[in-house]
Amino acid sequence: MNYRYRAMTQDGQKLQGIIDANDERQARLRLREEGLFLLDIRPQKSSGVKTRRPRISHSELTLFTRQLATLSAAALPLEESLAVIGQQSSNKRLGDVLNQVRSAILEGHPLSDALQHFPTLFDSLYRTLVKAGEKSGLLAPVLEKLADYNENRQKIRSKLIQSLIYPCMLTTVAIGVVIILLTAVVPKITEQFVHMKQQLPLSTRILLGLSDTLQRTGPTLLATVFIVAVGFWLWLKRGNNRHRFHAMLLRVALIGPLICAINSARYLRTLSILQSSGVPLLDGMNLSTESLNNLEIRQRLANAAENVRQGNSIHLSLEQTAIFPPMMLYMVASGEKSGQLGTLMVRAADNQETLQQNRIALTLSIFEPALIITMALIVLFIVVSVLQPLLQLNSMIN
């Protein structure tokens, strides 16, 4: 959630800006850590002008980051770099955004402050890394790391989507074929069986019952599914229900461990990027939670950051969240002892992502043939149920 704040620096200079945080308490805490004296803070109201998200894809944002890193490494002034990238961009909205950022820089604002006007495009992680690069004088290397980080996330997401396309299409086709057979084909073939004086086989009676039920209650079922889906969506938007739902997902077999594995790898990778860019550990732990989608996991990791603030070790604090597997915790503990925390966190994230990709591939390799076999058995049942009374009728005629 975005919060608009007014604060005063230790030098007495007043400033205002926007900060992303889970809640107001975390926003106040992070501003205090930056050495700011908070004057006012409130949730940012949704406004059609200021908070409208520009339609810019993740790949375009990554390309912009990579180009800016290259031009910065070539010692080209920042405002000139933004002008060049904006002119070459095929996305008019991105060009408009870069022009506004460039105007803010020409007015004397640093890049990190200029990006605050577009919080939905440049999130707090992006802005914090840019700010760290500006302070350290290593903006180009930090932007390279940020581009690599975004590319890695895109690759993982693309692989997951690509691996799910075929099973989803196969499932949709299978369900569609069964519905067409039961509602259109089977009734026409089996309507002649109704007048048979002899009792129909059990499988045929079951098939006729399913077909009749689906034809009578089909529209009602569709309406019920739609109403339930809309009701569930409205329920998620009320109060703390989304948090409760996310906590419930973590207790579901297979789904819970998968969510924990994906989020734990993303968290450690984000934290390693922040730490290697000069962001303080506690700030990095709080910022890393914002890259996660599950609210329950975000809350647990926020509690872990608070434990570290109180003097506990990182690996013990992370262990209490019940999110990280033993191997990841072991590598974090080794990194704490050896002083190579960032390096070992990256390795732990790499190992976890590779393991999860292998598990997903194995699961899908089992699911696809299982679905085909199930579909074949359903079609076989329909064929047998139709043929049995036909053969029975043929024997009666003979």
Curated annotation (Swiss-Prot):
Keywords: Calcium, Cell inner membrane, Cell membrane, Membrane, Metal-binding, Protein transport, Transmembrane, Transmembrane helix, Transport. This is Putative type II secretion system protein F. InterPro entries: GspF/PilC, T2SS_GspF, T2SS_GspF/T4SS_PilC_CS, T2SS_GspF_dom, T2SS_GspF_sf. Induction: Silenced by the DNA-binding protein H-NS under standard growth conditions. GO terms for cellular component: plasma membrane; type II protein secretion system complex. It is found in: Cell inner membrane. Belongs to the GSP F family. Residues 186-216, 387-398 are periplasmic. PANTHER family: GENERAL SECRETION PATHWAY PROTEIN, TYPE II SECRETION SYSTEM PROTEIN F-RELATED. GO terms for molecular function: metal ion binding. One of its GO terms (biological process) is protein secretion by the type II secretion system. The chain crosses the membrane at residues 165-185, 217-237, 366-386. It comes from Escherichia coli (strain K12). Ca(2+) binds at residues 90, 144, 148. Residues 1-164, 238-365 are cytoplasmic. Type II secretion system is composed of four main components: the outer membrane complex, the inner membrane complex, the cytoplasmic secretion ATPase and the periplasm-spanning pseudopilus. Homodimer. Interacts with GspE and GspL components. Pfam families: T2SSF. The keyword RNA-binding does not apply.
